[in-house]
Amino acid sequence: MTKQDYYTTLNISNTASQLDIKRAYKKLAIKYHPDRNQGNKTAEEKFKKIKQAYEILSDTKKRNLYDQYGHSAFEQNNNSNNEFHSSFTTSTSDFNDIFGDVFGDIFGSNKKNRKEKGSDLQYNIILTLEEAVKGIKKEIRIPKLDKCQSCYGYGSAYGSKPSTCTSCNGHGQIHMRKGFFSVQQTCSTCRGTGTMIKNPCKICFGQGRIKKSKKLSITIPAGIDTNDQIRLNNEGEAGKYGAKSGDLYIQIKVKKHPIFKRDENNLHCKIPINFVIAGGSIILYSSFRGEITVPTLEGKINLKIPSETQSGKIFRIRGKGVKSVRKGFQGDLFCKIIVETPVNLNSFQKKILYQLGESFKNYKGENNSPKSKRFFNSVKKFFNNFTK
């Protein structure tokens, strides 16, 4: 049974932020929680799926594995002891956790020292079809703002430490009371970090990060396609003052192939075959052999061609397409036969074709070209009705 995509389960895109994931989970979990749907088995199953999707996508390491390999990343053991498939339990505290700090997420957190995460980066990789289908390792170099190794990203000079902000007492937030309401705002002095740097690092000038180029080894999974993304957690730009780094998104583009055209997990190719024509009749050159050689990404194979095969006929070769990067099944190869009209004929070849035409019951070869006969009969009938 095909499992639903975790992003689809939470009604979010695969580029959703952690905050978006958390909001989506809370919204759906509140709706389908068993405490609100007692006796409703459908809602209970839905809640299980929502909770499982959240457990994977809210964990950066698990999410990275899922983005690259899909459900198969968590099905290697295929048993109940799989660490990524926890048992289903519910409680009142679990229900309360869903509400938790939902308003804090939207209007500002009450947690101290929330530092701004570093920016996400994107790197474009162009692959050949063979590389995309079989998978490959690529070495790339990313220019970015990385953590300063002199101050370990905190911005203070060696031997000193950031001091607590006196404006917010290290909370990063300032509470302002207006009548009956208390409004929470980011501290303008420390910009929400909760700390102040009195003795800045001379290497990064107190920023906690410097410009550098970092070399990375990227594993491209087999079956990846154009517009797919690979997410590398914490490989984006470093955050200021020791904050968490952003993520790196590898954007995939597959080059056009001279033989094959890809359609999801299937491959398509056109195979030209010689023929002899006389009076509209077509005889495949391949009919004398019975089979032709067909290219695949795994090597050559033989394909039997029935006699009198017409141009445009498509043959399906199962299991010779692309293996799905997520679902694991193998696509097929579709070969379209293109009957090629011969050109540059000499007098001897023209004579043979003429003799072939003469061997038919009449020169038009209607018995050998039934489609042509039906077409011209329809044309004749059309003009007869047109002139009445």
UniProtKB/Swiss-Prot annotation:
Cellular location(s): Cytoplasm
Sites where the protein binds Zn(2+) 1: 148, 151, 201, 204
Record InterPro entries: DnaJ, DnaJ_C, DnaJ_domain, DnaJ_domain_CS, HSP40/DnaJ_pept-bd, HSP_DnaJ_Cys-rich_dom, HSP_DnaJ_Cys-rich_dom_sf, J_dom_sf
Cofactor list: Zn(2+)
CR-type zinc finger segments: 135-213
Source taxon at top rank: Bacteria
PROSITE patterns per the UniProt record, alphabetical: DNAJ_1 (PS00636), DNAJ_2 (PS50076), ZF_CR (PS51188)
Annotated keywords: Chaperone, Cytoplasm, DNA replication, Metal-binding, Repeat, Stress response, Zinc, Zinc-finger
A GO biological-process term: response to heat
A GO molecular-function annotation: ATP binding
CXXCXGXG motif repeats: 148-155, 165-172, 187-194, 201-208
Cofactor, free-text remark: Binds 2 Zn(2+) ions per monomer.
A single Gene Ontology CC term: cytoplasm
Binding site for Zn(2+) 2: 165, 168, 187, 190
Domain J: 5-70
Pfam families: DnaJ, DnaJ_C, DnaJ_CXXCXGXG
Protein function: Participates actively in the response to hyperosmotic and heat shock by preventing the aggregation of stress-denatured proteins and by disaggregating proteins, also in an autonomous, DnaK-independent fashion. Unfolded proteins bind initially to DnaJ; upon interaction with the DnaJ-bound protein, DnaK hydrolyzes its bound ATP, resulting in the formation of a stable complex. GrpE releases ADP from DnaK; ATP binding to DnaK triggers the release of the substrate protein, thus completing the reaction cycle.
UniProt similarity note: Belongs to the DnaJ family.
Domain remarks: The J domain is necessary and sufficient to stimulate DnaK ATPase activity. Zinc center 1 plays an important role in the autonomous, DnaK-independent chaperone activity of DnaJ. Zinc center 2 is essential for interaction with DnaK and for DnaJ activity.
Subunit structure: Homodimer.
PANTHER family the UniProt entry points to: CHAPERONE PROTEIN DNAJ, DNAJ HOMOLOG 1, MITOCHONDRIAL-RELATED
Name of the protein in question: Chaperone protein DnaJ
Gene label: dnaJ
